[in-house]
């Protein structure tokens, strides 16, 4: 039996819980929307021609190697268009990773994981380390991405 109360915190706690759920649904909806249209810009000009030419080559190269970087440079305007139209890429933002939202980061991490699955030498942890240097990623953000990948069985 509970002692008599002058204040019952439960209604406020339930209201708070409900509000947190509503706010989380905003983020979840955005993530779901992105999951159904990820990289669609690659299926139309000016990107499709560039990705048709370079994707088979990129699959054969080691991610982060000088040859890989050279191939990216060769993608020119098609890749620039892709970055400009897809906010899950740090290159989309003037301030790189620091311009991104949590939903951008979630899509980016999923993209990096899926990309490693397209390469015979793909390794998400190695890719994260390469991208830490490439994008000047903080140790804290690297830890968060590694923890997330481990939590979902990606590492």
Predicted regions and their residues:
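Metal-dependent phosphohydrolase cores
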Residues: 1-155
């Amino acid at each position: 039996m509970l002692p008599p109360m002058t204040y019952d915190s439960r209604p406020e706690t339930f209201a708070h819980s409900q509000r947190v759920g509503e706010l989380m649904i905003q983020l979840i909806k955005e993530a779901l929307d992105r999951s159904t249209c990820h990289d669609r810009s690659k299926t139309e000009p000016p990107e499709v021609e560039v990705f048709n030419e370079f994707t088979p080559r990129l699959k054969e190269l080691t991610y982060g190697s000088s040859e890989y970087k050279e191939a990216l440079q060769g993608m020119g305007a098609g890749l620039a268009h892709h970055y400009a139209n897809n906010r899950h890429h740090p290159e989309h933002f003037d301030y790189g990773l620091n311009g991104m939202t949590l939903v951008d980061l979630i899509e980016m991490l999923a993209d990096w994981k899926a990309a490693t699955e397209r390469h015979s030498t793909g390794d998400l942890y190695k890719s994260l380390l390469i991208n830490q240097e490439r994008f000047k990623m903080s140790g804290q953000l690297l830890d968060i991405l590694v923890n997330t990948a481990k939590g979902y069985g990606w590492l």
